[in-house]
C-alpha cells in the first residue's frame, strides 16, 4: 500500500489540480473484488499506462473514472472534480475510447461523429465544424460520407477515436485502443494520437496488452494484478530492476506471472482461474 500511496497526489507541483487523482479506490462485483484499494495520479500532459492481465481491474478503474459506474469506496477526481459528485462536468472534460466497438455501422462516419457532438449539446453549426475537424485529423475526411460498414478495422478505430475527440477533451482515456488491429493500423492510430498530443498537450490514460506499445508510448506505467498495483515507474525504471537486457514483457511475466504461479502453488488454482474468468467478463 505504501508503494501505491506514493503514486497518489492531489495537485501538480504548480498547485493546479491533476488530470487524474485516484485514492484508495475499491470496486466489487458480488464476491469478486475487481479493484482493491489502488491509488495513483497522472501529471498534466503525461501518457500513463495501466497494464495487467484480463481481470486485473483496469477496465473497472476506467469505468469509475469515466463515471460509468460508482466505486464502493475511495475517490477519483478529474482536474479536481469528483467523479461521483461532479459526474456531468467530468464527462465534458474527458474523451473515452472503450474496448467495445461504439460506432454505428449503419450510419456514415460523419453521422456517427455528429451524434457524439450532439450528446455534448454543441450548437448545430459547431457540431458540423467539430465533426469535420476530427474526421480530418484522423485521416477520414475523404470517406466521411461512406457507411461505416464499408470501413476497414483500422478506419473504424480511427472513427471511434474521432468520436472521443469531438468535445476537445483535456483527458483522453483509451481502453485497449488497438486490440485486434494489424501492426500497420496500430501504428497509424498511435501516430495520429501523438500528433494530437503535440498540438494540444492533452493527457492520456492508456490500457493495452501490447507491451511494445506501452514501452514506446507511456511515460509512466502502473502494473495491476488481482485489483492491486504490483509495480509502477517509468518503463526504464521497471526494466532496470531485472537487468540491462530486460524488456517490459519480462517485467510483466515477473510481476504478474510469479504472482499467479504462487497462488496456484498454494492450491487455489481453480478458484484463481474462476475469479479471473469472472472478473474478465465484468471488466
How would you label these PLM feature ranges?
Residues 232-233:
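ABC ATPase "signature
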Residues 172-175:
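Catalytic Walker B motif of ABC-type/P-loop ATPase nucleotide-binding domains
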Amino acid at each position: 500500500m505504501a508503494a501505491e500511496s506514493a503514486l497518489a497526489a492531489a495537485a501538480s507541483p504548480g498547485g493546479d489540480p491533476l488530470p487524474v487523482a485516484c485514492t484508495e479506490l475499491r470496486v466489487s462485483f458480488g464476491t469478486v473484488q475487481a479493484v482493491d484499494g489502488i491509488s495513483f495520479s497522472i501529471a498534466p500532459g503525461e501518457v500513463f499506462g495501466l497494464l495487467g492481465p484480463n481481470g486485473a481491474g483496469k477496465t473497472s478503474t476506467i469505468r469509475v473514472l469515466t463515471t460509468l459506474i460508482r466505486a464502493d469506496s475511495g475517490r477519483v477526481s478529474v482536474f479536481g472534480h469528483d467523479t461521483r459528485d461532479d459526474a456531468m462536468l467530468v464527462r465534458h472534460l474527458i474523451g473515452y475510447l472503450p474496448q467495445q466497438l461504439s460506432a454505428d455501422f449503419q450510419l456514415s462516419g460523419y453521422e456517427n461523429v455528429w451524434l457524439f457532438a450532439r450528446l455534448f449539446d454543441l450548437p448545430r453549426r459547431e457540431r458540423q465544424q467539430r465533426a469535420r475537424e476530427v474526421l480530418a485529423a484522423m485521416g477520414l475526411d475523404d470517406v466521411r460520407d461512406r457507411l461505416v460498414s464499408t470501413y476497414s478495422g483500422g478506419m473504424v478505430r480511427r472513427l471511434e477515436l474521432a468520436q472521443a475527440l469531438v468535445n476537445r477533451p483535456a483527458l483522453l482515456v483509451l481502453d485497449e485502443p488497438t486490440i485486434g488491429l494489424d501492426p500497420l493500423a496500430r501504428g497509424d492510430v498511435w501516430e495520429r494520437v501523438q500528433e494530437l498530443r503535440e498540438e494540444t498537450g492533452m493527457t492520456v490514460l492508456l490500457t493495452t496488452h501490447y507491451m511494445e506499445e506501452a514501452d514506446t508510448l507511456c511515460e509512466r506505467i502502473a502494473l495491476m494484478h488481482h485489483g492491486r498495483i504490483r509495480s509502477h515507474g517509468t518503463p526504464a525504471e521497471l526494466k532496470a530492476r531485472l537487468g540491462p537486457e530486460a524488456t517490459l514483457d519480462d517485467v510483466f511475466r515477473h510481476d504478474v506471472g510469479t504472482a499467479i504461479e504462487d497462488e496456484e502453488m498454494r492450491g487455489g488454482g481453480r478458484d484463481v482461474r474462476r475469479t479471473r474468468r469472472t472478473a474478465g467478463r465484468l471488466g
